[in-house]
């Protein structure tokens, strides 16, 4: 019984150690895989930039095909499958992630790729997106925007994916250099075929380095230890040849010279354009100074005119107040004079009343002249003397001078 228990205990310990070893091995493999993909992506970007100095990059360029394969492998690294109704996971393309995570990019091409007629599968749409983003020079912006949406990235990828690790920031940075390249792609070519996955060609980036402890050269070691059949698969034969013929060097020199001439012409054109723009800028600056001076002068004139108008308004207000005070003073003076001289007003009123009374008396006695007759006759005068005691008759002199008592 004791031996059985010890055996079971040792077996359980051995099983636990084996499980820990498997986890560490899988973690190492995942780290190596991530490091390999990021390194190959850096190499592919560098070779793509170097090739763009000599020719236009299109679908036939092997450097671009290798870069597209590397980027597709990176975006598909540890991508979760799509769960069906029956609980099974179906394979998913990285386009499903890009379509959701890159919606926030301004003026994105997501809808255009979704509406393409000759592209049906998700893998083909993802490859078309890579080409369109490179032609638009926005691939780095798409990747950066997608990586910032950590919630969506976490939903589409498993733990240990490149887009969830520290390598993601390196990926967005190295893709930024591709914005300086002019790409030309045909979105109806064979490169968009989504039937087969992309395969990375590692041979352009492999280089055999001789150890410092080795005595013989690499060629002697390969001839000694390798056969004729195996020599064809050595890195020497697979990679670029070490010695190039004279024609190849001449062609490369010719291309470099043509590139130099083109660059020199572009440099002269840009310098001439720069001088023209500098002249235009100096003219604009001088015109701007003149306009600013005019604006300052007009502002100063407006301020002076405003001050003058305000001064005139103040003067007019003072004059108006003085006139109002004079009118009020004249009214007070007239009232005071009327209150100080009441006899004059009473005499005027009495004269007016007497005149009115005389007129009324004359109108009340219209037959008086007929009874008295003419004032020139003696009889009339005698008859008038007898009536002197009456107050209503005036004196003969008054009657003679009065216009109303003229003889008929």
From Swiss-Prot:
Phosphoserine modification, residue list: 216-217
Biased composition (Polar residues): 225-236
Any coiled-coil regions, as ranges: 301-326
Chain positions with Omega-N-methylarginine modification: 13
Disulfide bond annotation, renumbered to this chain: none
Keyword Coiled coil applies: yes
Keyword Phosphoprotein (UniProt): yes
Signal peptide, first to last residue: none
Segments of skewed composition (Gly residues): 8-22
Start and end residues of each RUN domain: 58-190
Ranges for region Disordered: 1-25, 213-238, 337-359
CDD domains: RUN_RUNDC3B
Alphabetically ordered keywords of this record: Coiled coil, Methylation, Phosphoprotein
Family: Belongs to the RUNDC3 family.
Subunit structure: Interacts with RAP2A.
Protein name: RUN domain-containing protein 3B
Organism per entry: Mus musculus (Mouse)
Lineage: Eukaryota, Metazoa, Chordata, Craniata, Vertebrata
């Amino acid at each position: 019984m004791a031996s059985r228990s010890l055996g079971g205990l040792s077996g359980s310990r051995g099983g636990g150690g084996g499980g820990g070893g498997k986890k560490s091995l899988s973690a190492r493999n995942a780290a190596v895989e991530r490091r390999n993909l990021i390194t190959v992506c850096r190499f592919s970007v560098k070779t793509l930039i170097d090739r763009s100095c000599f020719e236009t990059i299109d679908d036939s360029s092997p450097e671009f095909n290798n870069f597209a394969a590397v980027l597709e492998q990176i975006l598909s690294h540890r991508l979760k499958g799509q769960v069906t109704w029956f609980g099974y996971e179906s394979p998913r393309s990285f386009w499903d992630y890009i379509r959701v995570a890159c919606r926030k990019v301004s003026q994105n091409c997501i809808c255009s790729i979704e509406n393409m007629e000759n592209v049906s599968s998700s893998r083909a749409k993802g490859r078309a997106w890579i080409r369109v983003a490179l032609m638009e020079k926005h691939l780095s912006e798409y990747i950066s925007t997608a990586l910032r949406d950590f919630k969506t990235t976490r939903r589409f990828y498993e733990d240990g994916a490149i887009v969830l690790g520290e390598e993601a920031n390196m990926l967005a940075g190295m893709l930024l250099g591709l914005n300086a390249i002019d790409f030309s792609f045909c979105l109806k070519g064979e490169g968009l075929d989504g039937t087969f996955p992309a395969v990375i060609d590692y041979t352009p980036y492999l280089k055999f380095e001789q150890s410092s402890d080795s005595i013989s050269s690499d060629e002697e070691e390969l001839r000694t230890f390798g056969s004729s059949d195996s020599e064809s698969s050595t890195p020497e034969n697979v990679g670029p040849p070490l010695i190039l013929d004279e024609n190849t060097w001449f062609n490369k020199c010719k291309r470099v010279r043509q590139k130099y001439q083109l660059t020199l012409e572009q440099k002269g054109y840009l310098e001439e354009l720069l001088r023209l723009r500098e002249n235009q800028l100096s003219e604009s600056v001088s015109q701007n100074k003149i306009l600013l001076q005019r604006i300052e002068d007009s502002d100063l004139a407006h301020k002076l005119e405003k001050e003058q108008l305000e001064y005139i308004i103040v003067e007019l207000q003072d004059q108006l107040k003085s006139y109002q005070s004079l009118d009020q003073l004249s009214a007070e003076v007239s009232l005071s004079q009327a209150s100080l001289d009441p006899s004059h007003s009473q005499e005027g009123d009495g004269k007016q009343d007497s005149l009115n009374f005389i007129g009324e008396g004359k109108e009340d006695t219209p037959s008086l002249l007929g009874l008295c007759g003419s004032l020139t006759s003696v009889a009339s005068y005698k008859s008038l003397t007898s009536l002197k005691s009456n107050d209503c008759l005036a004196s003969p002199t008054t009657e003679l001078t009065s216009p109303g008592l003229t003889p008929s």
